[in-house]
Regions:
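C-terminal hydrophobic structural anchor segments
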Residues: 102-123
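Short loop/turn segments that connect beta-strands within beta-propeller blades
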Residues: 38-42, 77-80, 125-129, 164
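Extracytoplasmic beta-rich repeat domains
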Residues: 1-22, 43-60, 84-107, 131-149
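Beta-propeller domains
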Residues: 20, 27-33
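Surface-exposed loop/turn positions within WD40 beta-propeller blades
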Residues: 31, 69, 118, 157-158
Length: 164
């Protein structure tokens, strides 16, 4: 899901996938920038300081994203104001947090399902960002979860993991 652009040997820009509400397109990158762009004109509606490379989720008037540091942010879709920030990696020891780099997430049934680069699936209550559970599914990077037919699927290398 991440797009990488290299400019010589000095700058590497990684963007998230684009998400849209039909009027604006939203994207973030690893340079601490989160944008709302007018879909027709390309003009920036607002810009926020959020360091994220993963696809955001639009829910009603809000945009939910997870930063590279494991902060779950809820932003106002209309003006970019940060409404809420929760550290979803707070239960992980500081020196181990780099191992839990967020890869992708979905929100379903009031829960956030977040995959990491070290094969973990975090199940977090969306309302208060408390841990429900952490599942060790693999030792390597998992892809972004997919919700289909009341079940969650996660791809890894050449396999699909089904979560009930």
């Amino acid at each position: 899901p991440t797009r990488t652009l290299g400019f010589g040997n000095n700058i590497t820009l990684r963007n998230s996938d684009l998400v849209s509400d039909g009027t604006f397109v939203y994207m973030s990158n690893n340079k601490n920038e989160f944008y709302a762009l007018d879909l027709k004109t390309g003009i920036i509606k607002w810009k926020q300081k959020v360091n994220s490379e993963i696809r955001s989720v639009i829910i009603s008037d809000y945009i939910v994203t997870v930063s590279n540091e494991g902060l779950m942010l809820v932003l106002d879709r209309n003006n970019g104001s940060i409404i809420r920030i929760n550290n979803i990696l707070r239960e992980i020891k500081r020196k181990k947090r780099d191992d839990y780099y967020p890869v992708g997430f979905i929100i379903s049934g009031g829960k956030v399902y977040l995959t990491t680069k070290n094969g973990r699936l975090f199940v977090i209550n969306f309302s208060d960002a408390t841990f429900n559970k952490v599942l060790k599914l693999d030792r390597d990077k998992l892809q972004r979860p997919v919700y289909f037919n009341k079940e969650i699927y996660i791809t890894k290398d050449n396999s699909i993991i089904k979560i009930n």
